[in-house]
Amino acid sequence: MKTLGEFIVEKQHEFSQATGELTALLSAIKLGAKIIHRDINKAGLVDILGASGAENVQGEVQQKLDLFANEKLKAALKARDIVAGIASEEEDEIVVFEGCEHAKYVVLMDPLDGSSNIDVNVSVGTIFSIYRRVTPVGTPVTEEDFLQPGNKQVAAGYVVYGSSTMLVYTTGCGVHAFTYDPSLGVFCLCQERMRFPEKGKTYSINEGNYIKFPNGVKKYIKFCQEEDSSTSRPYTSRYIGSLVADFHRNLLKGGIYLYPSTASHPQGKLRLLYECNPMAFLAEQAGGKASDGKERILDIIPESLHQRRSFFVGNRHMVEDVERFIREYPDA
């Protein structure tokens, strides 16, 4: 049995930018995940379920657990003095860590993805993304350090809190998964160099919004539902409503996750920096693909911290099919 800490140290030589700081940073995220795991499992026993009454910068009602997870991760990262600052889906602006101007890294995160599912005991997750800062070390970080394209990520990953708690991450040298053993208090290696299955047979989308989807996406959904034995169709529809949970299932079983633009969200709804970029990095490292329907996610130059984007991620052949339908059936 190999722990996450042992694995990170063992694999440092494979990663050109590996430093003790990055190892400690991943350890801080691991600690934050343990705290969130503990409190999610007793959320119904303490008063951290439901809405907090506040809204985030996107105008969405924040759940109590969103704010709890955000504060715990922020505290874990700041305590190590190895992160110059963070950007979070739950923060209006970047958070600059005073006294950490010497740190080389910044972290972007969605502290609790799918938190509205907590009340009904459905899987949720934490998503994180790590970049090297671009401003001079020794000075406070600025927004410029966070507005980098996804292809500049040095590490990314997620934690899924389900029937078991798993941490999945990449540093650009494959995707590795670790299951949390609460009796020992450690994450143990369970899958090394994960890959999408050769063929995917599942599509994950909120079909309740079908009437609002672009023409190309509507055509793709019908394509998924048609019978064709040569391509193993019809595909199976599975949608949890938590990006982390849907992505994790599709990574293991093969499939595609779709969150297209709609009339109410013409640019898409998922956040480029906190959700799309880290999941795209993981997908590509696992042999998959991630796109906004026209462009590779990791090549998009971000313009703002909370920028949204359409998002299609999963098996390469399935994402390429979506792109083809979007090209062939443009909206009038």
Curated annotation (Swiss-Prot):
GO biological process terms on file: fructose 1,6-bisphosphate metabolic process; fructose 6-phosphate metabolic process; fructose metabolic process; gluconeogenesis; sucrose biosynthetic process
Textual note on the cofactor: Binds 2 magnesium ions per subunit.
Keywords: Carbohydrate metabolism, Cytoplasm, Hydrolase, Magnesium, Metal-binding
Binding locations of Mg(2+) 2: D110, D113, E275
EC number: 3.1.3.11
Cofactor(s) needed for function: Mg(2+)
Pathway participation: Carbohydrate biosynthesis; gluconeogenesis
Binding locations of Mg(2+) 1: E89, D110, L112
Reactions that this protein is recorded to catalyse: beta-D-fructose 1,6-bisphosphate + H2O = beta-D-fructose 6-phosphate + phosphate
Residues that coordinate or bind substrate: D113, G114, S115, S116, N206, Y239, Y257, L258, Y259, K269
UniProt-recorded name of the protein: Fructose-1,6-bisphosphatase class 1
Lineage, uppermost ranks: Bacteria, Pseudomonadati, Pseudomonadota, Gammaproteobacteria, Enterobacterales
